[in-house]
Amino acid sequence: MAKEEAIEVEGKVVEPLPNAMFRVKLDNGHTILAHISGKMRKFYIRILPGDRVTVELSPYDLTRGRITYREK
């Protein structure tokens, strides 16, 4: 997925799932499955339920995404 094609949206982590997956409720009301980006995994950034996150969505599958940023 090229960086230019990704759709960036914000949401809130609802629940953690196995294999570093999370259920995220987006600000527009949709709920998606998201995994942690490689840089966040590399630097051991912890994501807990209730955290505000930025998610990149692929234009091909809007039900799955990649968490790229956790707000402080």
Swiss-Prot record:
Subcellular location field: Cytoplasm
Coiled-coil positions: none
PROSITE patterns: S1_IF1_TYPE
Superkingdom classification of source: Bacteria
PANTHER family per the UniProt record, alphabetical: TRANSLATION INITIATION FACTOR IF-1, CHLOROPLASTIC (PTHR33370:SF1)
Function: One of the essential components for the initiation of protein synthesis. Stabilizes the binding of IF-2 and IF-3 on the 30S subunit to which N-formylmethionyl-tRNA(fMet) subsequently binds. Helps modulate mRNA selection, yielding the 30S pre-initiation complex (PIC). Upon addition of the 50S ribosomal subunit IF-1, IF-2 and IF-3 are released leaving the mature 70S translation initiation complex.
Protein name: Translation initiation factor IF-1
High-level lineage: Bacteria, Pseudomonadati, Thermodesulfobacteriota, Desulfuromonadia, Desulfuromonadales
Gene responsible for this protein: infA
